A protein has these predicted regions:
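Solvent-exposed beta-strand/loop surfaces of large extracellular or lumenal domains
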Residues: 34-58, 385-396
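Intrinsically disordered, low-complexity Pro/Gly/Ser/Thr-rich segments with frequent PxxP/GP/PP motifs
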Residues: 58-79, 401
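Terminal, non-catalytic domain-edge segments
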Residues: 427-449, 650, 654-662, 666-670, ...
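Surface-exposed beta-strand/loop patches in extracellular or lumenal glycoproteins
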Residues: 5-29, 220-234
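Glycine- and aromatic-rich loop/turn segments at beta-sheet edges
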Residues: 1-4, 452, 481-518, 559-580, ...
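Substrate-binding groove/exosite segments of carbohydrate-active enzymes
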Residues: 333-335, 377-380, 386, 390-396, ...
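Conserved beta-strand->loop/alpha-helix structural units within folded catalytic cores of enzymes
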Residues: 209-210, 407-419, 523-549, 587-607, ...
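Beta-strand/loop-rich accessory regions of lumenal/periplasmic or secreted enzymes
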Residues: 96-425, 430-446, 499-505, 521-524, ...
Length: 869
């Protein structure tokens, strides 16, 4: 498998990447990695998925990006050969010791510390690493004073101790050891706000920490007032020999506990200049005396309070004021503390994107300074998890039901930090390089042609521009991604619990997305923008698309689904708050949304989330819509059963546990026995124990569109191929034909069973229809599918599609403000996904020229309008 470094990324630090293997080619976890000159590079490998025959489908690999450079080749090797270990883990009664060259760190088995006793070159660097959480309790009361009503808001904030309930060594290899810590925070004996922290310790001494916060508490009173990791560091030397640095969007900020300014006695100005350069000022009795008469700045904090502002502050006394010395727009999230012997640096991923965050150091002149990486910084307004109103609005504002369930209990968010303990002084350029490795890590991939040839993630097309219409379609696919990338910045879709998600529907009259309107605000995977972006990335290898897709998957896998409790594995439908809608469904949280990120990058947190989604089938019992009065369950063949199939198929390929395959095959067999297969129902009785679907007859007055537009076609076709199920593939084709036919034709071909059933616009089902046309060899049907799909975006008088903009105002400086007034994420995601898949299934029937397409549309105008127009 040939690998290349993704565009716009640098070959620095460690790379974790996925290998994809054709069925039957690789059996063992034994691989070799060669650089571009054919030299073998140290490699650590794991199997992440297998084919049904037991051969390797996906593998996870860790290697030095610096050594691999722009690319190389990954290949199977003889199973007897092993890598020479650069890192060793020794298990002892009271914990583990990890060593790599001159680096050493302890992982204690008991106590409050995650990590301890970190040394480099024989020098102690970090004494402790602990989770830190601050919880605020807010209450509002009305009081009467002198005849006046006064609203009194009281907020009490406490720092809660973290209790580690379990510690485990997940993996230990020649280059990396991964430890997992699960715990809770205690408030007066009550368990609050669980955490899961992974420490990935690399062979060069890099320590990467993925910290997941879970909400467990009372959303009416519990506010998040601070969350992060605190490092007990070790510094030596005089205060004027110590050094603090922050990375900013300008020059690196340098400071010291004691600055060598002194007005009563002339000091060599070169001393201050040397301090600023990070050079060690030699200790001297005279300087010690002078330092006693200078302020001692012991506390520093860089705070990113929004996506548009940061400040650097410091204070000399606990009860003294903060002084603000520098401000800017976007800090990249880097801090370092140094003395004459050592540097400990901290780098944070998505620092300003996931604001409010901070990097703080306390007691900088003391023996044990504390450095805290705040993922939610304490000076920000405590985060409020309450809903926006006391009722729901299912009729007026597109919210799901008339009952409330805006519950954040069980949702999560994950942040990443890296720590670099180094002997001596780490130069500014090295700090920036460290930050780049964390913010924009090296990603290694195969070419799109390789994934396409071996059908990774199902059916999708490679870009083609050999005809007028194909070239136009590719421009539209590019423009759609560009537009959403621009909207993230333009609309400031940033913040700890928001970053990565898109809004659902645009309101042209306000020139805003419907951020405050019920089910029209945050999208929460509605109509699978995840599938659109990941398939667009696979076919292009575009870094800008990868950035959108990765952020979307990281957000939706954590914030938009439940990770414990009675709704575990379910996700919340689109709403103004990510957890606000009463609809909790498996379609929002299914594993298929995130499989590409997991397999391409080996991200373990995404693996956790996909495992959590397995609980969705059982959790349906907690939801009134799925649970009937007698306690039995009902599901629709799509998007409910299709989402469960996504979860089960992912679990099966990761574990080869036959239970999950049997669940899928049971449902396929049950559907096969119905009069119309996937078109029957669409509601069935459901048994979460064995996956059994009970046919309960045909329904009228319902719509089938949700069966098709939530990834159903992609899930079923990939599952059919993985399991070799011709029955499922045929049912998809038959269903696609019913979606293609008009009402009278459907009634006739179904012998009246589908009378009164709505199937919706082709925007929902074009790829399923394309599968039907391909399987039946019906070229006329294929041409008509293209006419309908392309005609939803193209017209002779408006061929610009996603490239079009309308000016609605101007800034004071005359800069035009523009938008796409008809845009919606539903339409964008669906049109792009359908075009990508249909171009693979029925490529030859796509019209070649605009003249041909326009003539077809004039001859037979579409009955559907542009979605959202």
């Amino acid at each position: 498998m040939k690998l290349h470094l993704m565009e716009h990324r640098k070959a620095g630090g460690w790379a974790v990447f996925g290998g994809y293997w054709p069925e039957g080619k690789v059996r063992e976890n034994a691989f070799a990695l060669l650089d571009g000159q054919g030299r073998e590079i140290p490699l650590q490998s794991e199997i992440t998925a297998r084919w049904a025959d037991g051969s390797v489908q996906w593998s996870r690999h860790t290697a030095s990006a610096e050594r691999l450079g722009p690319g190389g080749e990954l290949m199977p090797r003889a199973s007897g050969e092993t890598e020479r270990a650069q890192l060793q883990v020794t298990e002892e009664r009271d914990g583990w010791t990890v060593t790599a060259g001159d680096f050493r760190i302890r992982v204690p088995r008991k106590g409050e510390d995650l990590l301890s006793a970190c040394e480099r070159d024989g020098k102690e660097m970090i004494r402790s690493v602990r989770p830190v959480l601050r919880l605020a309790h807010a209450s509002e009361t009305e009081e009467t004073e002198n005849g006046r009503k006064i609203c009194v808001t009281r907020t009490e904030t406490a720092e809660l101790p973290g209790v580690i309930r379990s510690r485990m060594l997940e993996t230990a290899g020649p280059l990396e050891a991964v430890f997992r810590f699960d715990g809770v925070h205690l408030e007066e004996g009550a368990e609050k706000m669980p955490f899961r922290i992974r420490a990935m310790i690399r062979a060069d001494g890099e320590i990467q920490l993925d910290d997941t916060f879970f909400f467990l508490g009372d959303p009416e009173s519990d506010r998040l007032a601070g969350w992060g990791l605190r490092f007990g560091t070790v510094l030596s030397g005089r205060p004027y020999q110590r050094h603090l640095r922050y990375l900013t969007d300008g020059a690196v900020y340098h400071d010291h506990p004691t600055q060598l300014f002194y007005w009563r006695k002339h000091l060599d100005p070169g001393l201050l200049a040397a301090q600023q350069r990070g050079e060690t000022v030699p200790a001297a009795e005279e300087l010690d005396e002078i330092a006693e008469d200078l302020p001692r700045w012991d506390r520093f904090c860089l705070t990113q309070d929004s996506a548009w502002h940061y400040s650097i502050r410091k204070k000399a006394w606990d009860r003294g004021c903060w002084l603000t010395g520098a401000e800017g727009k976007r800090a990249p999230g880097g801090m370092a503390v140094s003395d004459p012997e050592r540097t400990v640096s901290f780098q944070v991923r998505d620092f300003w994107e996931k604001h409010p965050g901070a990097l703080e150091t306390e007691n900088l002149s003391g023996e044990q300074p504390a450095c805290t990486v705040w993922f939610y910084e304490p000076s920000a307004e405590p985060f409020d998890f309450r809903h926006y109103d006391r009722r729901t609005y299912p009729m007026g504002n597109y919210e799901g039901f008339d009952y409330m369930r805006p519950d954040p209990n069980g949702i999560a968010v994950t942040c990443r930090a890296a720590v670099y303990p180094s002997a001596g002084y780490t130069a500014d350029e090295q700090l920036r390089a460290q930050n780049e490795r964390i913010r924009n890590p090296a990603v290694y991939l195969a070419d799109p042609e390789y994934y396409h040839a071996h059908r990774a993630f199902g059916y999708w097309s490679l870009p083609r521009k050999d005809t007028e219409v194909r070239a136009w379609t590719e421009k539209q696919l590019e423009a759609a991604c560009d537009f959403y990338g621009e909207e993230v910045e333009r609309r400031s879709w940033y913040g700890l619990f928001n970053y990565g998600d898109f809004m659902h529907t645009y309101e042209a009259s306000r020139h805003q997305w419907r951020w405050d309107v019920g089910g029209y605000a945050w999208d929460n995977t509605e109509l699978t923008p995840t599938y659109w972006l990941w398939l667009q990335f696979l076919r292009t290898g575009s870094e800008r698309v990868f950035r959108l897709a990765e952020a979307l998957s990281r957000h939706t896998s954590d914030v938009d689904m439940y990770h414990f409790g009675e709704m575990k594995g379910l996700g919340s439908r689109h709403n103004v708050r990510h957890w606000g809608c009463p609809c909790k469904e498996p379609r929002v949280s299914m594993a298929g949304h995130h499989r590409p990120l997991y397999y391409l990058t080996g991200d373990r947190r995404i693996g956790d989330c996909m495992e959590d989604s397995l609980q969705a089938a059982e959790s349906l019992r907690a939801m009134p819509w799925f649970r009937r009065e007698d306690g039995s369950l009902r599901v629709r063949s799509g998007p409910d059963w299709s989402a469960l199939v996504s979860n089960w198929m992912t679990a099966y390929e990761r574990t080869l546990d036959p239970r999950w395959r049997k669940m899928i095959e049971q449902g396929i067999e049950d559907l096969r026995k119905t009069p119309l297969g996937l078109s029957s129902g669409p509601q069935f009785g459901f048994s979460p124990e064995d996956g059994h679907l009970t046919y309960e007859g045909e329904m009228s007055g319902v719509s089938m569109h949700l069966q098709a537009c939530m990834g159903g076609t992609e899930i079923w076709l990939e599952t059919a191929e993985r399991l070799g199920s011709r029955e499922l593939a045929d049912m998809v084709a038959r269903n696609g034909r019913f979606f293609f036919l008009n009402a009278e034709e459907r009634k006739r071909e179904s012998e009246g069973l589908l009378e009164g059933r709505e199937f919706g616009s082709p925007i929902y089902s074009a790829e399923m229809q394309a599968w039907a046309a391909r399987e039946t060899g019906d070229a006329g049907m294929a041409a008509e599918i293209w006419r309908r799909l392309l005609g939803l975006l193209y017209a002779e008088d408006r061929p610009e599609g996603f490239l079009g903009r309308e000016e609605y105002a101007r800034r004071p400086d005359g800069t035009p403000l523009t938008d796409i007034p008809w845009i919606s994420t539903n339409f964008t995601a669906q049109w792009c996904l359908k075009a990508i898949v249909a171009a693979e299934l029925i490529p030859e029937e796509m019209p070649g020229s605009f003249a041909e397409l326009a003539a077809a549309l004039r001859e037979k105008p579409l009955p559907w309008k542009l979605y959202g127009a």
